[in-house]
């Protein structure tokens, strides 16, 4: 009798857990569908704004982000030679379209990079050959260090 009650209780709990999982799965799918519909509506509005030339800075940023994500996803695909040629043509077409829009930012970034390359790094300015950060001599033989000590004593 006790075993039968235990089996019923176990079955009841398993059924309850199964129903909970189904409910969670349905809620997750509904959220995904709502999110996807929202994204599609947002993209449609952005496309209309882009066609009319009324994109805000936030919308441009969002479109650039989506473009970068799509490009990253496309790079992960394994392509045949024909597909690679088509992808290269598409890539050049996309770059031609978006290249002129973000030219000022690219020029500014390149100018900053050239300045950084021209300036020496701060950590290299403070380094001395043959010394560790604790100023202990490294890579010098005992003879060299004793010769220096003798010449210092003679002066």
From Swiss-Prot:
Lineage, broadest ranks: Eukaryota, Fungi, Dikarya, Ascomycota, Saccharomycotina
Source domain of life: Eukaryota
Key word GTP-binding present: no
Gene coding for it: RRT14
Keyword NAD: no
GO (cellular component) term, any one: nucleolus
Protein localization: Nucleus, Nucleolus
InterPro entries for the chain: Rrt14 (IPR031404)
Record's keyword terms, sorted: Nucleus, Transcription, Transcription regulation
Basic and acidic residues: bias regions: 1-31, 39-62, 115-128
Function statement: Involved in ribosome biogenesis, probably through modulation of rDNA transcription.
Organism field: Eremothecium gossypii (strain ATCC 10895 / CBS 109.51 / FGSC 9923 / NRRL Y-1056) (Yeast)
Biased composition (Acidic residues): 141-155
Family from the record: Belongs to the RRT14 family.
Region (Disordered): 1-74, 100-155
Name of this chain's protein: Regulator of rDNA transcription 14
């Amino acid at each position: 009798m006790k075993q039968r009650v235990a089996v019923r209780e176990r079955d009841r709990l398993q059924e309850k857990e199964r129903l909970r999982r189904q409910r969670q799965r349905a809620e997750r799918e509904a959220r995904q569908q709502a999110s996807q519909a929202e994204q599609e509506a947002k993209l449609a509005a952005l496309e209309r704004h882009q066609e009319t030339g009324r994109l805000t800075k936030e919308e441009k940023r969002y479109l650039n982000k989506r473009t970068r994500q799509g490009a990253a996803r496309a790079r992960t695909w394994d392509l045949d030679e024909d597909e690679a040629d088509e992808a290269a043509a598409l890539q050049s077409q996309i770059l031609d379209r978006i290249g002129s829009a973000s030219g000022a930012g690219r020029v500014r970034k390149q100018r900053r990079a050239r300045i950084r390359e021209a300036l020496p790094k701060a950590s290299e300015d403070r380094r001395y050959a043959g010394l560790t950060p604790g100023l202990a001599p490294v890579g010098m033989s005992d003879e060299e260090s004793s010769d220096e000590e003798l010449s210092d004593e003679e002066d």
